[in-house]
Amino acid sequence: MRLNFWLAITALVVAAVHASTLTPSVLPLIVRNPYLSIWFNHARGYPWANWPMFWTGSTVGFAVMAAVPDSNTVYPLLGRSQDFLGRSSSYNVSFPKYHGASFDASTTNLTYTIKGTDLKITLSFLSPITPTSTFRQSLPAGYLTAFVEGSHDVSIYIDVNGEWVSGNRKNQIVWNFGKSTSRSSGTPIKTWSIRRQDEQLLTEFNDHAEWGTIHVSAPAGVEHQSGEAHHVRRQFAQDGSLKNRVDETFRGIFEEEPIFAFSKRFKLSKKSNSSSAAKDSVRFTFALTQDPVAQFAAARGLTQMRPLWASYFHSAEELIQYHFDDYETATFLAHNYSEQLAKDAYASGSRDYQDIVALSARQVLGATQFSGIPDSPLIFLKEISSDGNFQTVDVIFPAFPFFLYTNPRWLEYLLEPLLEHQKSGQYPNEYSMHDLGAHFPNATGHADGRDEYMPLEECGNMLIMALALANAFKDNPRPTFSQTPPEEAIALAAGPVRLPNSVDAYGMDRSFEEMGTTGEKAAVEWLARSYKLWKQWTRYLVEEALVPANQLCTDDFAGPLPNQTNLALKGIVGIKAMSELAALIGEKEEAKYYGFVAEEYIEKWQDYGLSSDKSHAKLSYTWRGSWTTLYNIYADALLCFHLPEDGSSLDNGRFWNTKQAPIGGASKPHFIPDKIYKAQSDWYYAVLQRYGLPMDSRHLYTKSDWEFFAAAVTSKKVRTEILQHVAKWVNESTTDRPMTDLYDTEGTGHFPGIYFMARPVVGGHFAFLALERACGGKAVEGLKFLDEAEPTDIDVQESLMADMARLEEPPRKMGEL
């Protein structure tokens, strides 16, 4: 039974070879958190042309080779090992035929054939996304499986160096070689463990962690060797094998560069026959263990936070063994997620959309660290590559559609550190904080209140995410993805913490019902715990949202601007969200009040924020002849304020029975009128550029997260056009780092002088997928009117000039607004 299951899993993994059509410039290999983040750069070229890289672009020593004894030839497969081989009478160096890369949400496959043979080699890198197993998602580890097929003998080799454990290449490293003891249910394995000689806890150098140990494991039957890079790689090239020797002279990362290698020989010639080629594989695992993972100014004070996995295992060795043996289950769950994601993306967008969200998924989770305890997990998030802040609210916000789609509870675990810290009184301002700390992994807070000043932005973000999460708990209490592990799943052994209520014996998340509650009860309880904060932040919005002061929005690189139309909309939708939050926990009078304020503000906002011909939203109330991508309108649809007109008025809250008094005595079918959705959809169609939708009229650069927020609430035709333009950028972009969210929509699609890379905000690419699940599946139905007519033909220049012509009119006094 286990063999059949293994064959089925193998077929699933290799099938991913055919799963992608786009050709991004960089692909994820092993990406689990901000410090275990290995990428294939220049991914449109040969994998042996460059070394793999850390997300910053710095190289990482990681080589894979194949040796064919019949011809005494060694073939570099990944990394520039050929630079170390030189010329020799003992072996030949050649390159395989490379058939390209393919990927799904969890897997990247590189496929090769060897000239003059029937050998086929697939390197399959798996960083499993397991939405129904938070336990597995928390494991800081990934897999490389080498699949071989043919009738010729072949050996596979891998090595790593000290660049995995320090950004300062002058540092000294130490290492250990160990073997696990055979267990009744465990696979005997060998492990290289490498770390800095003098670790610096919770410290970074060029964004690399300066503490922690990388563990590289393989089955006990493989050969191993450590030593100077030239010597070890030439040893494999010469013999197709290693000497099972350990270099015990600790030294610097590039001091007679020590590397740590495994090799595996496959006797395929003895297994194949005339009717079929032999197939085999070898698995390697890579785990970066760090304890602590962060320090956090929690309610109890500054605390060194342990990794979540430490609640399940007594030691790193236990973690490594379980992870190695759990490959089949992790693969099964990851494939289930990838397959469902592909189906949903194709149904709602296109084949290109499949690839874009698949490419984005690991990047989102690559910014996270899982901490806390099993019944109260926390997810910490690094604002990768921009400021490096800890738990940045306006980075979580663009990423949150990914979490709503994948596992809404993970969004709860992201928001909880922000709520706990602010409820404890450690943040002095009345508005929501921007982040928990100036630099990850240190969430020491901002007791002086001098974090980056984005008060309106962050208050709106927190309230919108709070209601979206509550709705998700209520409407979709059970995840779409598989909650049943395969029969071969390995039960968790007794760990330091007794088996939690939220996790079953096989590490699968329990549903709300299995935990003795319901999604709606869980939503109410979660909201009630922080109700004081929700009210506090809404008071700020009531005072400041309608006419925003000169302040930053999340797009802070563009600078501050007063009267921002899009920012005001976020604040007003945030007030509307508060009316629903209040209603959900039974505060009916407050719900009515905030609902009334929101309705009054949205009426005025339409007057202030739209162009004179009502064809588009202005960048700023007072900036005539400007336009903006109105991405914050997405929240209106996501929060169920724009449901189909089926006889039930939206003036009735979704969670309470008292009717809100309508503005002006007339019932409104929608919070934001259809005409604004239609106008923006048509406008986007008119201003599209070669590589997508510019952010606003100031520049030709764009933010891909906001492109997808905007596209989610346009007509299908416009959405398809935006997707196709972004897909064209993915295929043609000259950017050479993990997918940027900020790029030029013209020229070469390069960075616009600001280098964003590997940021979790690409979770915004899931905006339409999250919208399809919102409101019990009814959110997208409320937007079907957009498909009833073709986009209106707009003369953009004429519209902008007409708006500017009104500059001669007396300006409105903002004090009278």
What are these regions (language model features)?
Residues 165, 364-372, 408-429, 470-474, ...:
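Long, well-ordered core segments of solenoidal/helical folds
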Residues 1-19:
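Fungal secretory targeting signals
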Residues 188-244, 385-395, 401-408, 420, ...:
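Extended ligand-binding clefts on enzyme/binding-domain cores
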Residues 20, 136, 152-154, 158-393, ...:
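Acidic/polar, glycine-enriched structural segments that form the non-catalytic walls/loops
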Residues 27-118, 207, 216-231, 236:
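An extended acidic
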Residues 312-320, 388-548, 564-582:
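Aromatic-rich carbohydrate-recognition surfaces in CAZymes
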Residues 22-53, 455, 462, 622-645, ...:
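C-terminal capping/lid segments that line or modulate ligand- or cofactor-binding pockets
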Residues 37-41, 64-67, 112-114, 148-149, ...:
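Well-ordered alpha-helical scaffold segments within catalytic/enzyme domains
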